From Swiss-Prot:
Annotated CDD domains: TyrRS_core
Keyword Protein biosynthesis: yes
Subunit structure: Homodimer.
Motif ('HIGH' region): 38-47
Protein name per UniProt: Tyrosine--tRNA ligase 2
Physiological role: Catalyzes the attachment of tyrosine to tRNA(Tyr) in a two-step reaction: tyrosine is first activated by ATP to form Tyr-AMP and then transferred to the acceptor end of tRNA(Tyr).
Chief place where the protein resides: cytoplasm
A Pfam family per the record: tRNA-synt_1b
InterPro entries according to UniProt: aa-tRNA-synth_I_CS (IPR001412), aa-tRNA-synth_Ic (IPR002305), Rossmann-like_a/b/a_fold (IPR014729), Tyr-tRNA-ligase (IPR002307), Tyr-tRNA-ligase_bac-type (IPR024088)
GO biological process per UniProt: tyrosyl-tRNA aminoacylation
Alphabetized SUPFAM superfamilies for the sequence: Nucleotidylyl transferase
Keywords, sorted A to Z: Aminoacyl-tRNA synthetase, ATP-binding, Cytoplasm, Ligase, Nucleotide-binding, Protein biosynthesis, RNA-binding
Binding site for ATP: 223
Length: 302
């Protein structure tokens, strides 16, 4: 099965910026990045599902880079509702180190911190080299920004998408990155990066988003929703992760098997054919597989 076909079958593709990306994914060799801001000291299950795509693409010969946004975390991503409180710099730096150590155990790829290339940029240089390429009207039309105008948005959060666009430009010019992958809530920020690279270099780069992982009620797995399941053993033990997955509903268990495991299409379709609602058969396989992949332990249930 071709890579893009597998990603679509697993429900891991929501938007992509150009049809030519399909050919590059299936037959080319791309350097791509996926990232998170260190606003917490651990990945949660929603992050894990997104970061798994790095492994999926790496298996087909593509080169992943993982970005931890030390700079963007200090600014705060617009939520489309209300202004975030600014995080303390010391806390962000501490979170970065903890995330880096955690990520390296599961995803053995190069890790970069956008604080490293933004910390010494002067305000004048930022405005001249980057701000002049993106208009206020363009930024105001992004969906998250439009929604937040009702309650007010600071210039700090308004500038977040430009900082993320700078990341794409920096990684393109220094590491040859031509693809950014993220959750679907980041689409507006990602297309800003595409436009910034095109305007500054004349080159085409790409973006692809994944649907956010949600529960049976449509709520995403994340700390902003208050239902995060953490990867760190200090926040959720392997047993707690296992129990959570054992109790997911029949409505979403097959979808989670596709998104959270490397089980083949043949294996998952066989599990689906054998699964009967209320038996917990598919949930058991999901819980055992994901817990072992993350923590390297098997949970014996009597």
């Amino acid at each position: 099965m071709k890579l893009f076909e597998d990603l679509q079958w697993r429900g891991l593709v929501k938007q992509y910026s150009s049809d030519s990306l399909i050919e590059k994914l299936n037959n080319g060799k791309l350097t791509f990045y996926i990232g998170t801001d260190p606003t917490a000291d651990s990945l949660h299950l929603g992050h894990y599902s997104s970061f798994l795509i790095a492994k999926r693409l790496a298996k087909y010969g593509h080169q992943p880079i993982i970005l931890i946004g030390g700079a963007t975390a200090l600014v705060g991503d617009p939520r489309g509702t209300s202004e975030r409180d600014l995080a303390e710099q010391e806390k962000i730096f501490d979170n970065f180190e903890k995330l880096k150590n955690q990520i390296q155990k599961i995803f053995p790829y190069e890790i970069v911190n956008n604080y490293d290339w933004t910390k010494n940029i002067m305000a004048i240089d930022f405005l001249r080299e980057f701000g002049k390429h993106i208009t206020a009207g363009y930024m105001s039309n992004k969906e998250l920004v439009k929604r937040q105008f009702a309650t007010g948005i600071s210039f700090t959060e308004f500038s977040y998408m430009l900082l993320q666009g700078m990341d794409f430009y920096h990684l393109f010019t220094t590491k040859g990155v031509t693809l950014q992958i993220a959750g679907s809530d980041q689409w507006g920020n990602m297309t800003t990066g595409i436009d910034l690279v095109r305007k500054k270099t004349g080159e085409e780069v790409f973006a692809m988003t994944m649907p956010l992982i949600t529960d049976e009620e449509g709520k995403k797995f994340g700390k902003s929703e208050g239902n995060a399941i953490w990867i760190s053993e200090n926040k959720n033990t392997p047993e707690e992760l296992h129990n959570f997955l054992l109790n997911v509903s029949d409505d979403i268990v097959i979808s989670l098997l596709k998104k959270l495991t490397f089980l083949s299409r043949k294996d998952i379709e066989e599990i689906e054919s054998r699964h009967k609602n209320g038996t917990g058969y598919a949930q058991g396989i999901l819980a055992d597989t994901v817990t072992f992949d993350i923590h390297g332990v098997s949970i014996n249930k009597k």
